[in-house]
Amino acid sequence: MNSSWRVVVFLGLVILCHSRRARACNGGYEMIVHSIENCAGEGQIVTIDPKSTVTLMEDCKVKSKATARTVGFKTAMMDVTITKNGLPVLKETVDICANLEEASGNKEAAEIITMFGVPDHCPVAASEIRTDESQTYSLEKYKQHLLVAQGRSIIDVLVKHDKGESCFKIDMEVTSPNLIG
């Protein structure tokens, strides 16, 4: 999976979370989403219900209960900046529509798109996407990255659409398990 698609998948999972603490796989890592903010104002193209949740279970599976709404769009260029422990670690621009087209040929990406009900192509019609906790996705193959993810991260996402903008600010933290005792 290319790095742009990984960013999209990661943000998709994180954006669905809101103020939840979850014991993660691989010995009890904990993910805490302190806040998610829809920050483009009243005309925001895509919004996420602040009551949406994702639960990271001990068996390295994730399940979600979430609602996202869009007024529809034809284009979506995402600028994402991730700052970890106060230091910038990633700044990338991703053409979401191009990534959706590429994802259709990627079994892993297609599974995530299907699970979360994300449209698989642009243009995207006005819609509401809801997920429930009956579907799960395994993060088993990513658990070795938890040590690298450890610490506080601020994720700033700005998506420029043909009809306006979407903006999300996510404040999250990954803490390590207590290895002593």
UniProtKB/Swiss-Prot annotation:
Induction: (Microbial infection) Up-regulated in salivary gland following infection with P.berghei sporozoites.
Any single GO CC term annotated in Swiss-Prot or TrEMBL for this entry: extracellular region
Location in the cell: Secreted
Signal peptide start-end: 1-24
Keyword list, A-Z: Secreted, Signal
Single biological process term from Gene Ontology: host-mediated perturbation of symbiont process
Major subcellular location class: secreted
Tissues expressed in: Salivary gland (at protein level).
Free-text function comment from the UniProt entry: Decreases host neutrophil chemotaxis induced by N-formylmethionine-leucyl-phenylalanine (fMLP).
Note, other: Active immunization or antiserum against the protein reduce P.berghei liver burden in mice after exposure to the infected mosquitoes. Individuals in malaria-endemic areas have higher levels of IgG recognizing the protein.
Identification of the protein by name: Sporozoite-associated mosquito saliva protein 1
Lineage: Eukaryota, Metazoa, Ecdysozoa, Arthropoda, Hexapoda
